[in-house]
Each structure stands twice: as C-alpha cells, then as structure tokens.
C-alpha cells in the first residue's frame, strides 16, 4: 500500500485533464509515484554517499533525475 496520500494524486490526474478519477486509479497512481520517488531517492542517497556526505543536497536530486 502506498504511503503517499491518494487525494493529491487524484488532483494531479485532474490537473492533467481527467474529469473523474476512480478510487482504484488514484491508489494505483499513488503506488506508481511512490516507486518512482523511491528510485530517485535511492540514487540521490547514493550520490551523497559517493561524495562522502550524510546530507542529500539539491544537486544530488537533480543529478539523480538526470540519469
């Protein structure tokens, strides 16, 4: 089960143009976003560790998003 709240995910889907969003779609979207966010977070943490830092900085997140 996703830790991300479903309501903001539903708002994102509506912002993208959906008129209505089922509860199941909102939950599945939240789970998918969480998986994507965790992968970015893992890469960011790895980059911070590689730089011998405990703190994840914005440049780590930007680099993780780049690839």
Curated annotation (Swiss-Prot):
NCBIfam families: archaea_histone (NF043032). This is Probable archaeal histone 3. It comes from the Archaea. The keyword Lyase does not apply. Binds and compact DNA (95 to 150 base pairs) to form nucleosome-like structures that contain positive DNA supercoils. Increases the resistance of DNA to thermal denaturation (in vitro). Transmembrane segments: none annotated. Residues 20-22, 54-57 are annotated as: Interaction with DNA. It comes from Methanocaldococcus jannaschii (strain ATCC 43067 / DSM 2661 / JAL-1 / JCM 10045 / NBRC 100440) (Methanococcus jannaschii). One of its GO terms (molecular function) is DNA binding. InterPro entries: Archaeal_histone_HMF (IPR050947), CBFA_NFYB_domain (IPR003958), Histone-fold (IPR009072), HmfB-like (IPR050004). GO terms for cellular component: chromosome; cytoplasm. CDD domains: HFD_archaea_histone-like (cd22909). The keyword Cytoplasm applies.
């Amino acid at each position: 089960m996703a830790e991300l709240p479903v309501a903001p995910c539903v708002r994102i889907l509506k912002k993208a143009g959906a008129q209505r969003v089922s509860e199941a779609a909102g939950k599945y979207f939240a789970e998918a976003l969480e998986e994507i966010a965790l992968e970015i977070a893992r890469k960011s943490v790895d980059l911070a560790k590689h730089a011998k830092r405990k703190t994840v900085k914005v440049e780590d997140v930007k680099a993780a998003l780049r690839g």
